[in-house]
Amino acid sequence: MNLFQRVKYNFEESIKTKTAAIELLVDPIVQAGELMAQCLLNEHKILSCGNGGSAADAQHFSSEMLNRFETERPSFPALALTTDASTVTAIANDYSYAEVFSKQIAGLGSTGDILLAISTSGHSKNILQAITAAHIRGMNVVALTGRDGGELFTLLGTDDIEIRVPAESTARIQETHALIIHCLCDIIDRKLIPSSEDH
């Protein structure tokens, strides 16, 4: 396979993954978007976390909330727990990397808030501890996962929502997570900003 064929292959595999996800994920995406919109309407906030590319996804979501998505609107309260290098490195140094998100949630999370937890594998210890911390604080969890959901799946409660991409490839999962994040932003805007219905 030459490089031109490889690029075409990657596009085709990404399309296949998204196509397979349509029937499986529309319902949980809508449920999660509505849950997030209600959270914001009730004057609560959304915290997000992930590692590596998933950390970038967490920041992507929070930036769309704080700035705007495709509609002019007020800022919505959202915070990526991945961005404060001083806090993350202090917790990792003094305690452990597994606690870099959970300790922030213990200080920042409140009942009625939502945690957006992003993990392609579902096995990241700091994400697992973040979910446990969120539950202790009375928060609901929206989890973006892939593969078989990993250990993360076993921690979710009946009021939590998992959006699991039906793929094994980390790249394909992350590409679909980006689309899911845009879908969530679109739902939130349409629920909270009537003028967004026109776009």
Swiss-Prot record:
Cofactor: Zn(2+)
Compartment(s) where it occurs, according to its Swiss-Prot or TrEMBL record: Cytoplasm
Cofactor binding, note field: Binds 1 zinc ion per subunit.
SUPFAM superfamilies per the UniProt record, alphabetical: SIS domain
Domain SIS: residue ranges: 36-198
Binding locations of substrate: N51, G52, G53, E64, N93, D94, S119, T120, S121, S124, Q174
GO molecular function, one term: carbohydrate derivative binding
Pfam families membership: SIS_2
Primary role: Catalyzes the isomerization of sedoheptulose 7-phosphate in D-glycero-D-manno-heptose 7-phosphate.
HAMAP family in the record: GmhA (MF_00067)
The protein's name in its UniProt record: Phosphoheptose isomerase
Gene source species: Coxiella burnetii (strain RSA 493 / Nine Mile phase I)
Source species taxonomy: Bacteria, Pseudomonadati, Pseudomonadota, Gammaproteobacteria, Legionellales
